[in-house]
């Protein structure tokens, strides 16, 4: 799964989180969050953790094909 960078950045802004604080909130290494932000494909569970930390539904940040 790939996150939509624009949707993810907007959700981060709404939650007042930078990549480092998002990583801490999602309980994952900052490198993983940076990979998500760069458009790398990640496991659904990883995207789910990011979405939960942002308080959004995973479908809200998934890149549409």
Show which residues each predicted segment covers.
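Short, basic-rich loop-to-helix N-cap that marks the start of a DNA-contacting helix
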Residues: 39-52
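A short, Lys/Arg-rich alpha-helix, primarily the initiator
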Residues: 1-21
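Short alpha-helical "recognition helix" segments of helix-turn-helix
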Residues: 22-23, 50
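Recognition helix of helix-turn-helix/homeodomain-like DNA-binding domains
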Residues: 28-42
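Short C-terminal boundary/hinge segments that cap the last helix of small helical domains
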Residues: 55-65
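Residues within the alpha-helical elements of helix-turn-helix
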Residues: 14, 25, 53
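Key DNA-contacting residues within the recognition helix of helix-turn-helix
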Residues: 34-35, 48, 62
């Amino acid at each position: 799964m790939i996150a939509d960078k624009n949707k993810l950045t907007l959700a981060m802004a709404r939650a007042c989180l930078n990549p480092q604080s998002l990583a801490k909130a999602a309980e994952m290494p900052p490198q993983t969050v940076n990979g998500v932000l760069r458009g790398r494909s990640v496991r659904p569970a990883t995207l789910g953790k990011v979405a939960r930390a942002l308080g959004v539904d995973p479908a809200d940040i998934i890149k549409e094909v």
